Amino acid sequence: MARIAGVNIPNNAHIVIGLQAIYGIGATRAKLICEAANIAPDTKAKDLDETQLDALRDQVAKYEVEGDLRREVTMSIKRLMDMGCYRGFRHRRGLPCRGQRTRTNARTRKGPRKAIAGKK
């Protein structure tokens, strides 16, 4: 298995699909990386030689991926919460922060329903 940015790329996957296993690299960015490294997108990961892997590693290193990106996202959410703005307040309360309705729905963000003592 090829190892790029601390992630094992599956051997039997095309390199474009394998690059998407790295957090922060989607379909478009994976294609751009392959073009910049002069590698055909439909090449299997097991068919790459060491020079091609080094070229891919150099291209991926130009982007913020994996741990650094996760840390940046976490820090920006923490900054919003410390600032006390509306979005930070919604993050702190575990509610949607992009204007969705919450009277019904929003179960993913709010979690499972809490039981309320009913009348008997």
UniProtKB/Swiss-Prot annotation:
One example of a Gene Ontology biological process annotation: translation
Superkingdom of the source species: Bacteria
Positions of transmembrane segments: none
Region described as Disordered: spans on this chain: 96-120
Subunit structure: Part of the 30S ribosomal subunit. Forms a loose heterodimer with protein S19. Forms two bridges to the 50S subunit in the 70S ribosome.
PANTHER family: 30S RIBOSOMAL PROTEIN S13/40S RIBOSOMAL PROTEIN S18 (PTHR10871), SMALL RIBOSOMAL SUBUNIT PROTEIN US13M (PTHR10871:SF1)
Functional summary from the UniProt entry: Located at the top of the head of the 30S subunit, it contacts several helices of the 16S rRNA. In the 70S ribosome it contacts the 23S rRNA (bridge B1a) and protein L5 of the 50S subunit (bridge B1b), connecting the 2 subunits; these bridges are implicated in subunit movement. Contacts the tRNAs in the A and P-sites.
Annotated protein name in UniProt: Small ribosomal subunit protein uS13
